[in-house]
């Protein structure tokens, strides 16, 4: 008997019942669900096998590791058995968005947990959306148990990297689940050895009970690894725990220990009350749980029955369950004599003492089937109990017969009603309650009381009558290929008889509201299981939902009177939507209770109730409008929706208005007519026919109006109208009760005014488009609260169309996306008046009849969802089917990649270019002499190059030779995965190519005689041909519909001769290389069909090497050449550029079929990626029977310049170099280029190795390439060794790209290699593609501490110095040569500029010749023109952040010729002409520009504003000193500005010449000062000034007045006074920002400068809007 615990009963806290609502499981023998687990149990299967003799063991482990440890242990080979997975668990790396290196750095148990967690969460119906339920990611806890590590803590014997910490620290087991699923609640990883699962579940239950989390996922994992496995086997064996003959034998006489197993189990839990309230499917309920240390006083690992009894009794007590009600125990049952004895003893003590004989306690343990999964064993046991709950059956105990019962247990079974069953039987109990026991070798153990979930029925919602109508269904996946597989799984599942037992409404609820939403999806509507299967087989169009759903908005348009009459109480929506029904009933209840509307006007009530009900329905489904518009009568409902009127007041006013109309207007002969003609033409006719007294009642749109008049007047007007406009449409509106919005309603206005005055109106809570005013009324607009608003609305012209146009215009001006439109009413006539942009949509809400209500609304809802709108599917189902429950659905079809264990150090390769001992040759070397005929068919840039298809053929041949010795039988097919070009293009004019394979990873590599250089890497797979053909057939329904464009007149049809004449600019194909006979290119240029008769003769085609006799490269070329042709003829490129293959995601090819067919039909499509520098496409091939026989998916082709390709081949360089663009002296070029290129190549090499990439794209951030926090540390350590000049710790920013990283790593430039202004353009060679790309900050200039640029200072700024636009005290020095007309001109340089220009690179010439140059492109707001500084360039403006407008920079027009300004007034005129031309060509919607500039640019801007007020809207200057300030002479100014520009070569020389001439033109020109002082600036001006003064170096020996060269603006008033004297009232503001003149655009100050500039532009535009 257990000790007396009665005195402690009060201390036991109440246990909060916890619902198990989701489960995921893995076990040996392919167990991956409750169904497969149940099959194992009822079929009495055992998944145990002897390690030494089983191929599964040899695939996963090195037998020598075991042999070394167990050598000397008798009969060890016979002793070692286990229940292992057939294969090491892999990972769908793409699904979890992991880089290759990050995935390789994860522990295999972490990978397994991610997938099982996904399945458990899907089973629970967790969608990852914060919807106010207990499924709140911020309070979702994760508790995971484990007992082993993949890599032992001492890493000395194993290869380690930055991920060693992630792999070995157990905290990452729970952490990875939190990270990848976005769960932010408590997270814990525990280790109590074999009782880990129940401990983790206990921790989760306690956290749920205390409110630490509202949902939790908990369980355990155990995988035996080749790294730690041998040692753990050895330790357990030496401890005597392992059975000597094989499988665990719970309760049997021959049990001597346990058999190890692998597995994983996770359960998702909520508090029972939450699960019931939120409609979760409840697998079981944890009623009580107790964890205690139960070790024997003598030995820690010896179980103690007395202590177990105490824990079990406490678990039962806190559960509140009668022990007699517990009918089953899933025992820990490892099969050890002492363990089984202690456990059975405790069960009898607590549960069987006073038990009736006819209520026996059944005991079982699944360890006899699956072994002991150690840390995962507890969840295995719990999964078994849940499977029993679902089936209400008890499975047999494996290998049990009463005669085999352990003799030590027999007394307990004889004395107590306790049993073990040997045959499956029903679980007959009024309440099925079970105990789950889970014990650990460390003494920690626990018991769990679990009750079946069907006992706790969810709260039923309001009973809404249902009709046989379609329901929505959504299926989504990460990519198209996976979605195709998932659809196939659904089709098979729907055809299973058991699925028909699941209500269709539950399936709809589960697919739409209880699943993760992925980017690639389909949505369908179906009214039965078979209908759903049929719709899925028809392959509905896929939807790309990767865009942010919150970006799309919707507006409501409420219908007016005159449409089809629909009684909302007869609508199918009334029987389907609770929110619609409640809203409609409320309207009728208000009217009937207060008699607000007469029976004669019931049609008006029906229309109002219908529209109000539809509005409430849409809002309940998560479709909330951003704007409301109502056509005539519809504006009443719009005002209710906006909160201006209550429902009661709106109905009251409509009732009064209707009664007044009947009483006073029916005798008035007013009629209405709709006219389809432009408003201007109708107004013209109205003006001409005033005598008819016809009035304009409604402006529906620009081309539709409604007129009012007497029948006679309308007919007369119609006749005259059709004479002038015979095509005009005319329709008399006979169903209108009165001629509203005209003089015919004048008799009711006085009384209606009194009624309106009695109604309380409220500020609008939404945007309303006023038909009365013809404009948009923002939130809270007081005009809607005027009591005469509805009176005027009744009488005056309704300008619905004008209001719509005003709203759309305002959206354009504010750059607000235009919403989609839903018409709220019984038709879709009103939204036809709304003109939409190309990407806008419009939808109806209700069909024309009552029967169309639900189908129309559902179709609109799913179209909205497909278009990217947010739909709250949970609220939808709460509305239409509140009793819906989550149910089982097909599991997500993950695409697993094999797990690779860390290698032993001695197996580590010495060099990446040499084959290590574990690599084998799969194909003989192929000499270049045999390849030569193939190369002659593939000539690029004048070189015979090895084509990609030859590489593919070599890899397929290697895969085939590997498969020949395997178990594959019959016809085979082949797959390649992740083919990457490592070394670019191979010129194999001599030498050889060879394929080698890594045994550990199965990775294939193509190497050459060039120091075993690796050219290609890939993975290969061999499969049965029939399996591949079935897989490929899934794509066929998605491809064939596109065949229709072949017959369209817009399709380009190219025969062979024309096709290859177009293709020759890229590749010159020989006779055997021209495999395409005809090509059809669609109008969009992104799709093509092709036809090739090349197959058939390919086997005997000339030039196929012997080793490739069954893998003809040209035959393969016939299946994929079309994609290269399509990209190179359709993608944007310049002459001398080509798109070349550098990566292939997947290739599937049935070669036997390809050899048999007489021809192939090809379909190819692609999209632009990487900013247009690459294309990503697919190409599929059909044989002559229409069967899909090959697919090349995710073919990536990168842009490359042909001359660059030549250079790479000539020099043997890799295609990842960056070309140095700094122009330096000729004697310095080689030294600087070599140093920069050497560093750059090393950095790229480090990044490629760390990120496991074949290339480092320039346009992606390092984070996008896979650089995570741990990899960044690793990379930083390696890069620090490359940059000894750095003394600080290197921090790598994942948000930066390669250029930013190189900028950090490169040392400060020496005096010999000073960066130039043109370095704001970085010339890159990405994948062999030379391009000029702007970077975020210009290059650095050295400056001293006081801010002046010097030739030997420290680089702390990124801006080229520029001349400041000032005169000196109004007294110009006459350095210029006066012309005869008295105008001063600057001295022209004596040295020619041609030599300087000749030294510039073509890229630099292109950069400085782009004038004007678009710095930022964001159309809409007034463009900003920024004029160059004194150095003649506008590169500094690239440092600015986003200004929300188009920004244009102007270089000095004479920069290339070495010519500066001759006269500032003449130069200003030239710049004005450039600006006018740009406006005319590129900004047709703008007549003026905002202008500005830094330094001299500001001076020119002020001048332009004074001279050309018709062109300039406003000016913003950046540190431009006003004229008349400072004390420098022209000579002194020149010496200051030219001081840092001691060099005179290349671009440096051009900038120096600009400074010389611009300084003289400005400082030596008295005309400028006189003109600008005497000219009024009539545009607004905003001034930005640097806070600190500029201090020239003492070595220049300037006068004291030089300290005033730039004013000290520490006091803003100083600057304001100075500028006020020049600008007057048009000066809107002066802003002082940190820094001095030369630091305005440095990285430290660029953000501040940007913010100041944005503020200045906003102030100017605000002033202009107010003034205009």
Swiss-Prot record:
Pathway assignment reads:
Secondary metabolite biosynthesis
> Keywords on this record?
Phosphopantetheine, Phosphoprotein, Transferase
Carrying O-(pantetheine 4'-phosphoryl)serine, the residues are: 1269
Spans annotated as Product template (PT) domain: 935-1203
Query: Does the entry feature the keyword Transferase, yes or no?
Result: yes
Q: Where is this region: C-terminal hotdog fold?
A: 1050-1206
- A biological process (GO) annotation for this entry? secondary metabolite biosynthetic process
* Entry-linked InterPro entries: AB_hydrolase_1, AB_hydrolase_fold, Ac_transferase_dom_sf, ACP-like_sf, Acyl_transferase_dom, Acyl_Trfase/lysoPLipase, Ketoacyl_synth_C, Ketoacyl_synth_N
Where are the residues of the annotated region N-terminal hotdog fold? 905-1034
**Region Proline-rich linker region, annotated ranges:** 1339-1399
Q: Which domain of life is it from?
A: Eukaryota
Q: What is its EC number?
A: 2.3.1.-
The record, for Pfam families, names: Abhydrolase_1, Acyl_transf_1, ketoacyl-synt, Ketoacyl-synt_C
Which catalysed reactions does the entry list for this protein? holo-[ACP] + 8 malonyl-CoA + 8 H(+) = atrochrysone carboxyl-[ACP] + 8 CO2 + 8 CoA + 2 H2O
Q: Where is this region: Alpha/beta hydrolase superfamily-type thioesterase (TE) domain?
A: 1446-1531
GO molecular function terms attached to this record: fatty acid synthase activity
Q: Where is this region: Malonyl-CoA:ACP transacylase (MAT) domain?
A: 555-863
- Carrier domain segment(s): 1234-1322
Domain remark text: Multidomain protein; including a ketosynthase (KS) that catalyzes repeated decarboxylative condensation to elongate the polyketide backbone; a malonyl-CoA:ACP transacylase (MAT) that selects and transfers the extender unit malonyl-CoA; a product template (PT) domain that controls the immediate cyclization regioselectivity of the reactive polyketide backbone; an acyl-carrier protein (ACP) that serves as the tether of the growing and completed polyketide via its phosphopantetheinyl arm; and an alpha/beta hydrolase superfamily-type thioesterase (TE) domain.
Instruction: Give any extra note attached to this record.
Output: PKS1 is part of a new class of atrochrysone carboxylic acid synthases (ACAS) with unusual domain architecture and illustrates how the biosynthesis of bioactive natural metabolites evolvedi ndependently in various groups of life.
What is the recorded function of this protein according to its Swiss-Prot or TrEMBL entry?
Answer: Non-reducing polyketide synthase that synthesizes the universal anthraquinone precursor atrochrysone carboxylic acid from malonyl-CoA. Produces a mixture of both 3R and 3S enantiomers with an excess of the 3R form.
Report the protein name in the record.
Answer: Atrochrysone carboxylic acid synthase PKS1
């Amino acid at each position: 008997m257990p000790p007396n615990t009665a005195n402690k009963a009060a201390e036991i806290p109440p246990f909060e019942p916890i619902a198990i609502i989701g489960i995921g499981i893995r076990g040996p023998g392919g167990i991956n669900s409750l169904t497969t687990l149940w099959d194992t149990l009822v079929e009495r299967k055992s998944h145990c096998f002897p390690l030494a003799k089983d191929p599964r063991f040899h695939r996963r482990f090195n037998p020598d590791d075991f042999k070394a440890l167990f050598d000397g242990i008798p009969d060890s080979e016979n002793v070692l058995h286990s229940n292992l997975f057939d294969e090491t668990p892999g990972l769908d790396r793409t699904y979890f968005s992991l880089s290759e290196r990050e995935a390789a750095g994860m522990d295999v148990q972490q990978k397994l947990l991610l997938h099982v967690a996904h399945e458990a969460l899907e089973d629970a119906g967790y969608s990852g959306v914060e919807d106010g339920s207990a499924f709140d990611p911020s309070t979702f806890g994760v508790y995971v148990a484990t007992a082993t590590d993949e890599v032992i803590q001492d890493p000395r014997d194993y290869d380690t990297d930055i991920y060693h910490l992630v792999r070995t620290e157990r905290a990452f087991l729970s952490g990875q689940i939190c990270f990848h699923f976005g769960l932010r609640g408590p997270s814990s990883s525990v280790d109590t050895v074999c009782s880990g699962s129940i401990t983790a579940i206990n921790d989760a239950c306690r956290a749920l009970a205390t409110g630490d989390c509202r949902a939790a996922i908990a369980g355990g994992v155990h995988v035996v690894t080749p790294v730690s496995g041998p040692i753990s086997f050895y330790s357990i064996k030496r401890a005597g725990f392992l059975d000597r003959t094989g499988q665990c034998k719970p309760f049997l006489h021959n049990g001597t220990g346990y058999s190890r197993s692998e597995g994983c189990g996770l359960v998702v839990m909520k508090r029972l009350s939450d699960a019931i309230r939120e409609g979760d499917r409840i697998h079981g309920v944890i009623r009580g749980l107790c964890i205690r240390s139960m070790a024997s006083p003598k030995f820690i690992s010896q179980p103690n029955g007395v202590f177990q009894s105490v824990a079990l009794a406490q678990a039962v007590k806190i559960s509140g369950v009668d022990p007699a009600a517990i009918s089953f125990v899933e025992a820990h049952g490892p099969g050890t004599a002492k363990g089984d004895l202690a456990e059975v003893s405790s069960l009898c003590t607590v549960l069987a003492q006073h038990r009736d004989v006819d209520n026996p306690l059944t005991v079982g343990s699944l360890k006899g089937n699956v072994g002991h999964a150690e840390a995962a064993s507890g969840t295995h046991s719990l999964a078994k109990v849940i499977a029993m709950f679902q089936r209400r059956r008890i499975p047999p105990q494996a290998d049990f017969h009463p005669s085999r019962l352990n003799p030590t247990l027999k007394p307990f079974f004889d004395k107590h009603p306790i049993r073990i069953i040997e045959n499956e039987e029903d679980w007959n109990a009024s309440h099925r309650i079970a105990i789950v026991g889970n014990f650990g070798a460390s003494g920690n153990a626990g018991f769990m009381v679990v009750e079946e979930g069907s006992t706790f029925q969810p709260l039923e919602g309001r009973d809404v009558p249902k009709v046989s109508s379609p329901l929505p269904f959504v299926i989504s996946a990460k990519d198209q290929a996976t979605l195709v597989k998932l659809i196939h799984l659904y089709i098979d599942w729907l055809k299973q008889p058991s699925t028909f037992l699941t209500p269709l409404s539950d399936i709809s609820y589960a697919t739409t509201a209880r699943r993760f939403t992925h980017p690639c999806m389909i949505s369908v509507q179906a009214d039965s299981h078979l209908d759903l299967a049929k719709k899925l087989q028809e392959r509905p169009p896929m939807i790309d939902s990767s865009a942010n759903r919150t970006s799309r908005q919707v507006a409501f348009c409420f219908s007016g009177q005159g449409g089809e009459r629909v009684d909302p109480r007869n609508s199918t929506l009334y029987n389907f939507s609770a929110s619609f029904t409640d809203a409609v009933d409320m309207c009728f209840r208000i009217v009937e209770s207060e008699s607000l509307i007469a029976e004669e006007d019931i049609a008006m009530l029906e229309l109002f109730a219908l529209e109000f009900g539809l509005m409430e329905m849409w809002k309940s489904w998560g479709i909330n409008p951003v704007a409301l518009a109502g056509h005539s009568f519809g504006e009443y409902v719009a005002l209710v929706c906006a909160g201006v009127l209550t429902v009661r007041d709106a109905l009251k006013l409509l009732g009064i208005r209707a009664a007044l109309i009947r009483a006073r207007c029916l005798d008035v002969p007013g009629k209405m007519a709709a006219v389809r003609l432009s408003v201007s033409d109708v107004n013209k006719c109205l003006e001409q026919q005033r005598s008819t007294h016809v009035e304009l009642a409604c402006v529906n749109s620009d081309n539709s109006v409604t007129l009012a008049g007497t029948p006679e007047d309308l007919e007369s007007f119609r006749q005259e109208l059709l004479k002038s406009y015979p095509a005009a449409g005319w329709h008399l509106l006979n169903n209108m009760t009165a001629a509203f919005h005209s003089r015919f309603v004048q008799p009711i206005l006085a009384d209606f005014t009194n009624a309106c005055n009695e109604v309380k109106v409220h500020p609008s809570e939404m945007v309303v488009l006023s038909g009365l005013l013809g404009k948009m009324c923002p939130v809270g607009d007081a005009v809607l609260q005027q009591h005469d608003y509805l009176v005027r609305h009744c009488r005056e012209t309704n300008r619905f169309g004008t209001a719509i146009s005003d709203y759309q215009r305002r959206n354009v001006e504010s750059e607000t996306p235009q919403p989609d439109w839903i018409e709220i009413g019984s038709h879709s006539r009103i939204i036809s008046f709304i003109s939409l942009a190309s990407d806008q949509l419009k939808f109806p809400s209700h069909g024309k009849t009552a029967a169309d209500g639900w189908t129309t609304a559902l179709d609109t809802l799913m179209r909205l969802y497909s278009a990217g709108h947010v739909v709250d599917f949970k609220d939808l189902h709460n509305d239409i089917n509140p009793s819906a429950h989550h149910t089982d659905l097909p599991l997500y079809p993950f695409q697993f990649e094999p797990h690779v264990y860390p290698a032993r150090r001695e197996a580590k390769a010495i060099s990446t270019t040499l084959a290590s001992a574990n690599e084998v040759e799969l194909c003989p070397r192929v000499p270049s002499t045999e390849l030569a005929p193939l190369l002659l068919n593939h000539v690029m840039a004048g070189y015979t190059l090895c084509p990609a298809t030859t590489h593919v053929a070599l890899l397929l041949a290697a895969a085939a030779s590997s498969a020949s010795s395997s178990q594959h039988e019959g016809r085979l097919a082949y797959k390649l995965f992740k083919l990457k070009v490592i070394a670019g293009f191979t010129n194999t004019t001599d030498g050889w190519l060879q394929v080698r394979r890594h045994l550990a990873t199965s990775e294939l590599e193509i190497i050459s005689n060039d120091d075993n250089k690796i050219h290609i890497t890939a993975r290969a797979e061999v499969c049965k041909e029939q399996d591949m053909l079935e897989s490929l057939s899934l794509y066929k329904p998605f491809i064939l519909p596109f065949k229709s464009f072949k017959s369209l007149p817009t399709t380009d049809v190219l025969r062979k001769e024309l096709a290859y004449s177009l293709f020759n600019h890229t590749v010159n194909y020989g006779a055997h290389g021209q495999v395409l006979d005809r090509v059809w290119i669609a109008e969009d240029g992104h799709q093509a069909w092709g036809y090739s008769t090349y197959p058939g003769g390919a086997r005997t085609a000339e030039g196929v090497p012997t080793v490739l006799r069954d893998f003809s490269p040209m035959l393969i070329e016939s299946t994929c050449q079309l994609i290269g042709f399509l990209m190179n003829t359709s993608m944007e490129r310049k002459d001398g550029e080509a798109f070349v293959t550098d990566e292939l995601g997947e290739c599937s090819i049935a070669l036997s079929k390809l050899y048999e067919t007489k021809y192939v039909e090809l379909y190819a499509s692609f999209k632009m990626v990487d900013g247009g520098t690459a294309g990503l496409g697919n190409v599929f091939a059909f044989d002559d029977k229409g069967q899909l026989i090959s697919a090349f998916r995710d073919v990536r082709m990168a842009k490359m310049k042909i001359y660059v390709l030549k250079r790479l081949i000539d020099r043997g360089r890799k295609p990842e170099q960056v070309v140095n663009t700094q122009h330096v002296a000729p004697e310095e070029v080689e030294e600087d280029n070599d140093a920069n290129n050497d560093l750059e190549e090393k950095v790229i090499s480090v990044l490629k190795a760390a990120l496991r990439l074949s290339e480092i794209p320039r346009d992606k951030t390092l984070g996008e390439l896979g650089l995570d926090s741990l990899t960044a540390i690793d990379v930083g350590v390696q890069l620090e060794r490359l940059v000894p000049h750095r003394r600080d710790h290197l921090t790598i920013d994942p948000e930066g790209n390669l250029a930013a990283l190189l900028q950090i790593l490169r040392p400060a430039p020496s005096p010999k290699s000073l960066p130039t202004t043109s370095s704001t353009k970085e010339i890159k060679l990405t994948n062999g593609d030379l391009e000029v790309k702007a970077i975020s900050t210009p290059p650095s200039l050295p400056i001293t501490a006081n801010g002046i640029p010097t030739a030997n200072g420290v680089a702390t700024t990124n801006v080229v110095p520029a001349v400041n636009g000032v005169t000196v005290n109004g007294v110009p020095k006459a350095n210029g040569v006066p012309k005869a007309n008295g105008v001063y001109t600057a001295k022209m340089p004596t040295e020619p500029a041609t030599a300087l220009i000749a030294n510039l690179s073509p890229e630099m010439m292109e950069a400085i010749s782009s004038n004007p140059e678009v710095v930022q492109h964001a159309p809409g707001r007034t463009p900003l023109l920024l004029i160059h500084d004194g150095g003649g360039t506008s590169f500094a403006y690239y440092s600015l952040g986003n200004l929300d407008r188009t920004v244009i920079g102007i270089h000095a027009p004479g920069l290339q010729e070495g010519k500066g300004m001759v006269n500032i007034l003449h130069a200003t005129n030239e710049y004005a002409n450039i600006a006018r031309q740009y406006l005319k060509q590129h900004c047709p919607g703008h007549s003026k520009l905002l202008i500005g500039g830094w330094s001299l640019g500001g001076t020119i801007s002020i001048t332009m504003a004074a001279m050309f007020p018709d062109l300039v809207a406003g000016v913003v200057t950046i540190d431009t000193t006003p004229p008349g300030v400072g004390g420098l002479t022209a000579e002194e100014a020149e010496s200051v500005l030219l001081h840092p520009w001691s060099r005179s070569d290349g671009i440096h020389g051009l900038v120096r010449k600009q400074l010389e001439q611009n300084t003289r033109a400005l400082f030596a020109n008295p005309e400028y000062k006189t003109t600008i002082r005497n000219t009024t600036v009539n545009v607004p001006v905003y001034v930005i000034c640097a806070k600190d003064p500029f201090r020239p170096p003492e070595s220049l020996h300037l006068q004291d007045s030089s300290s005033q060269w730039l004013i000290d603006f520490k006091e803003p008033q100083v600057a304001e006074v100075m500028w006020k004297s020049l600008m007057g009232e048009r000066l809107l503001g002066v802003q002082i920002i940190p820094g001095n003149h030369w630091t305005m655009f440095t990285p430290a100050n660029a953000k501040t400068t940007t913010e100041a500039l944005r503020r200045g532009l906003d102030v100017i535009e605000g002033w202009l809007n107010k003034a205009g």
